[in-house]
């Protein structure tokens, strides 16, 4: 009985996902790209301008010169 319930719930989720994504196929790539860009942290290379250590790829910022340095 448990196996049948799991199969039924899985089938319901698959059909719901299929019907909700109809007509939106061309936008799926855009959503994926937006999600990836939000997850990607951009950092400043050594020698670039910085205001705090977390903006540098090396996590080291010389606050006197306001440039990222190698750590």
Curated annotation (Swiss-Prot):
GO terms for cellular component: extracellular region. Expressed by the venom duct. Residues 18-40 form a propeptide. Belongs to the conotoxin O1 superfamily. Pfam families: Conotoxin (PF02950). It is found in: Secreted. It comes from Conus abbreviatus (Abbreviated cone). This is Conotoxin AbVIG. GO terms for molecular function: ion channel inhibitor activity; toxin activity. The presence of a 'disulfide through disulfide knot' structurally defines this protein as a knottin. The cysteine framework is VI/VII (C-C-CC-C-C).
């Amino acid at each position: 009985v448990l196996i049948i319930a799991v199969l039924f719930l899985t089938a319901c989720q698959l059909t719901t996902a299929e019907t909700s994504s109809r007509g939106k196929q061309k936008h799926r790539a855009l959503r994926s790209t937006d999600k990836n860009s939000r997850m990607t942290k951009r950092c400043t290379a050594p020698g670039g301008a910085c205001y705090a250590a977390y903006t540098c790829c090396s996590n080291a910022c010389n606050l006197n010169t306001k440039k990222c340095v190698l750590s």
